[in-house]
Amino acid sequence: MKLTPKELDKLMLHYAGRLAEEALARGVKLNYTEAVALISGRVMEKARDGNKSVADLMQEGRTWLKKENVMDGVASMIHEVGIEANFPDGTKLVTIHTPVEDNGKLAPGEVFLKNEDITINAGKEAISLKVKNKGDRPVQVGSHFHFFEVNKLLDFDRAKSFCKRLDIASGTAVRFEPGEEKSVELIDIGGNKRIYGFNSLVDRQADADGKKLGLKRAKEKGFGSVNCGCEATKDKQ
């Protein structure tokens, strides 16, 4: 049996979830890892059964664990659990917010921040692009995803988004509802600008030749409008 790295990760997560289920059945309070594994494992199983929608699991997932089921401080550490699950009609992201009720106590390792604004991506020039979701499902794009290669049903000027990512905090995301149109800010991807993976539109150095190749592949694979006429304006210092 040969498994892909992604399949191995899911198998490991499923195994961890089973161990957490056994611990919970014995009355053992779960730690952070066990709680996340249990919730993720149940989501994957119920999604595979095909009897629940994403919305159903997002709601039901908040009922599986209570504060008395986890160790002190764990509830406040789990802000959300996101898992890509296989439904009968494809893979979908299920995000469960505040899956465990907070007990109100101080969390282990809690950080108290100063009451000051935090500047992200300081010194990076940004452009603004109008983006429209022409699909019938929400699309969520993470902070460091190569925006040029996002879902093909997002319509925008792909050429202007080459080698760029969202100008948002690391680990966060922007969500586009079906039919929604809004502007987003993009900044250059840092590092050596060698872009691999995502939707395999580049898979090389993101230079002029890489951009030309990427645009060609995007057009061939039907990635929205390669040039939809959206205007980009440099409006951030």
UniProtKB/Swiss-Prot annotation:
> Which stretches does the entry tag as region Urease gamma?
1-102
Q: Where in the cell is it found?
A: Cytoplasm
CDD domains assigned: Urease_beta, Urease_gamma
Q: Which reaction does it catalyse?
A: urea + 2 H2O + H(+) = hydrogencarbonate + 2 NH4(+)
Q: What class of enzyme is it?
A: hydrolase
Keywords in alphabetical order, please: Cytoplasm, Hydrolase
Q: Quote the subunit structure annotation.
A: Heterohexamer of 3 UreA (alpha) and 3 UreB (beta) subunits.
How is this protein named in the record?
Answer: Urease subunit alpha
Organism, by scientific name, is: Helicobacter felis
